[in-house]
Amino acid sequence: MDLNIADIAFDSGEVRYRYSRYLAEDGRKWIRHGLFTAYHKNGQLASEGHYVHGVEHGVWHDFHANGQLAAEGNYEDGKEIGEWRYWNPDGAQQST
């Protein structure tokens, strides 16, 4: 499988999404595989996690536009599993 990096931009040209992907065997669609990152319009990291053959897998982190951690949890085969934790933009942890 040959991976390449996709950069999807906001209208401003700044990176909105960056992820690795490969072309499906039938050549008709791209499948995310590996690190996925999303960014807020201000350039701060919005989300980071991994895909395995097109589905979320492993630890994911979401961030507020100010850079504070917003959420943390695990995916297994594209489904949220276990306890997820959440934080307010000021960094205070919310109840789960």
In which residue ranges do the predicted regions lie?
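Glycine/tyrosine- and acidic-biased, solvent-exposed loop/turn segments at the edges of beta-strands
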Residues: 1-96
